[in-house]
Swiss-Prot record:
The lineage of its organism: Bacteria, Thermotogati, Deinococcota, Deinococci, Thermales. It comes from the Bacteria. It holds the Pfam family PfkB. Signal peptide: none annotated. Homohexamer; trimer of dimers. The gene is kdgK. This is 2-dehydro-3-deoxygluconokinase. It catalyses: 2-dehydro-3-deoxy-D-gluconate + ATP = 2-dehydro-3-deoxy-6-phospho-D-gluconate + ADP + H(+). It is an enzyme of class 2 (transferase). Keywords: ATP-binding, Carbohydrate metabolism, Kinase, Nucleotide-binding, Plasmid, Transferase. It comes from Thermus thermophilus (strain ATCC 27634 / DSM 579 / HB8). Gene3D superfamilies: 3.40.1190.20. The active site is at 251 (proton acceptor). Its EC number is 2.7.1.45.
Amino acid sequence: MLEVVTAGEPLVALVPQEPGHLRGKRLLEVYVGGAEVNVAVALARLGVKVGFVGRVGEDELGAMVEERLRAEGVDLTHFRRAPGFTGLYLREYLPLGQGRVFYYRKGSAGSALAPGAFDPDYLEGVRFLHLSGITPALSPEARAFSLWAMEEAKRRGVRVSLDVNYRQTLWSPEEARGFLERALPGVDLLFLSEEEAELLFGRVEEALRALSAPEVVLKRGAKGAWAFVDGRRVEGSAFAVEAVDPVGAGDAFAAGYLAGAVWGLPVEERLRLANLLGASVAASRGDHEGAPYREDLEVLLKATQTFMR
């Protein structure tokens, strides 16, 4: 039986090997990505039974996405190849650390998710449904899909996890806040970053007041993370790594925290696992290539007290 289901738009990323403007590049590496895809792959590598709901185009990039997810052991019962194209994006890293992303996803097969896109009984017995704020930003249909999926999860006693994952290229702060206001009553576990809190609400404190959920996890980058649970704040320290490619690190963080929750770990150890996964992905090229397997965890945590038993 599945433990986690994620849903969203798969993407393919084209990434230069060295910093500099894309216009001067001749070789680009190809990676499979997308926020919910990254979460699914990271969970599968940890041995969590995970399913992915989504659409890709009837094209070679869609075939690439499907092959990757199957190879990683993600359940694809409600994954479909559909008319249209698979979303694509290009990343550009400049020498002083700035980065830009160029999306080619509007009207993609993956952005056409709508209510009824999967049999809601697929959620029976699942521990978590995980969504991100990217999916509802893609289209009115995808926004309705996100709310519908959350409602179906709640009907079946499934906890809903939502990563704010705000993208200012997809929608405005006002639109994002409007969606969050509608979604929050059904959210059990909320992830957001300090940067997102400030962009959407002006101050972190205001965001935490507005975004009340039973469990809120604030990602603080190199400063680690805070989890607000049962009226207390739990702090988790970051792992010091040299960031090679930060894209996907937040998704890996969410996957680590979710895995810890599925395993019944205390909040402190969920944060530790989340920070470890985020650091591992940030230290590697690609959206999820650096996500560790469960058998790697004890080695990676050897420098500190490990929770593996």
